[in-house]
Each structure stands twice: as C-alpha cells, then as structure tokens.
Amino acid sequence: YGGALKQLSIGCASSAGKAYIHSGGKVTDQHILWENCAEQDTFLEAMADAASTVAKHFAGKIAYVAVMKNLSVDCDCCAVAEDPCMNDVGILSSLDPVALDRACIDLVRNSNDPGREHFMERVNSRHGTHTIDSAETLGIGTQAYELVKV
C-alpha cells in the first residue's frame, strides 16, 4: 500500500536511501539492490523507520493529503503499472500519517467498488498494512481516527 508513510519514506529518500530501505538496511548501492532485497516485513518495517525519521524532523510543520483517485494495485514506481482497478474514493487529510493511511485502507476495505477485492488481495498478500502497524509502534501516530466530511 502506497500512502503517506510510503511517501515519507521511499518518496523522500535519495537513490541510496531507497536502496537502503528496500534492502532492510543492508546496502545503499542501487546497482546491487536486487541481490540484497529484504524480506517483505523487514522492508515494510524499514519504510516505517524511514518515515519516522522524516515525520519527526518535520513534526508540527507538516500536513498529509491522500488523493484516492484512480487506485491501482501497483506501485507508482513500476515501469509498467496495472491500470487503475478502483474508482475515485475521495481526498483525505490529516496531521497524522498513520491515522491517514489507516483511514484510506478502511475506506477501500469498506467500499462497494467492484475493484475492492482485487486491490485488497494485493495489499493483504504483501502485508501492506504492516507498515501502518510498525509506524504506530514507532510512535509516529495512531491508527485511531475520526472521518469528518466537508
């Protein structure tokens, strides 16, 4: 799942930082990354750790926005990403990236969109919400939220 936490980590990282996160802290050279990729949960925990660093650096000076439009199961960094499988869900914002990502996942999970099953199968098969759990454990934020429609 590529929400606020992913953008805080992978999205803010240099090429060396991206390699470091994807390898679970083993390498910073992107040319040898693919021989050193971390196990999935280790990678997700490294994303949460990197997100924690950025969130703490900008604490009190950052807001998070999620535009849930044209949702695809593939990462935005894929060279050939699958076409979007879900219709537009909405735009969410929060001062807490953990709450924002949890709310986004919950909105998808509880939607009636015909693409929901495909989307959630991909999230679940990749342990996608493990980053949210790890980020909460690191103290970045909480998974508790209140949706306010405007």
Task: Report the location of each language-model feature.
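Extended, low-polarity segments enriched in aliphatic/aromatic residues
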Residues: 1-150
